[in-house]
C-alpha cells in the first residue's frame, strides 16, 4: 500500500546543536510526481526568516524519496554544521 503525502506536506522544526541556530525543514508536493524539500533559517520562534529564499531547496520525483530526504536532512541538521551540510547537498 502506497503512502499518500498529506496535501500540506511535511514540516519539522530543527535546532542545530553546534551553532544553536534554528531551521524549518519543509516538504511540499509541487505536482503529480514532483516534491520539493526546503530548509529555511528561522527565528527564535521557528518562523522562517525569508520564505522566498530557502537556504537549501531540492526536488525529488517520488514521495518515498521526498520523505527519506526530508527526514535525513532534519536528522543531520541537528548535529552537523549547516554550511557544510548545505554545501554537500548543493554539489
Task: Please give the residue ranges for each predicted region.
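Short intrinsically disordered terminal tails
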Residues: 1, 83-91
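Short N-terminal "domain-start" leader segments
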Residues: 1-39, 43-44
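Short intrinsically disordered, low-complexity segments
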Residues: 41-45, 70, 78
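A short, exposed loop/beta-hairpin motif centered on an aromatic-Gly-Thr core
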Residues: 48-68, 72
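Short arginine-rich
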Residues: 71-86
Amino acid at each position: 500500500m502506497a503512502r499518500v503525502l498529506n496535501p500540506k506536506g511535511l514540516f519539522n522544526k530543527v535546532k542545530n546543536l553546534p551553532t544553536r541556530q534554528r531551521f524549518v525543514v519543509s516538504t511540499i508536493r509541487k505536482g503529480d510526481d514532483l516534491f520539493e524539500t526546503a530548509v529555511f533559517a528561522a527565528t527564535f520562534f521557528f518562523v522562517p526568516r525569508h520564505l522566498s529564499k530557502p537556504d537549501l531547496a531540492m526536488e525529488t520525483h517520488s514521495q518515498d524519496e521526498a520523505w527519506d530526504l526530508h527526514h535525513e536532512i532534519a536528522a543531520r541538521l541537528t548535529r552537523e554544521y549547516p554550511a557544510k551540510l548545505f554545501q554537500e547537498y548543493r554539489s
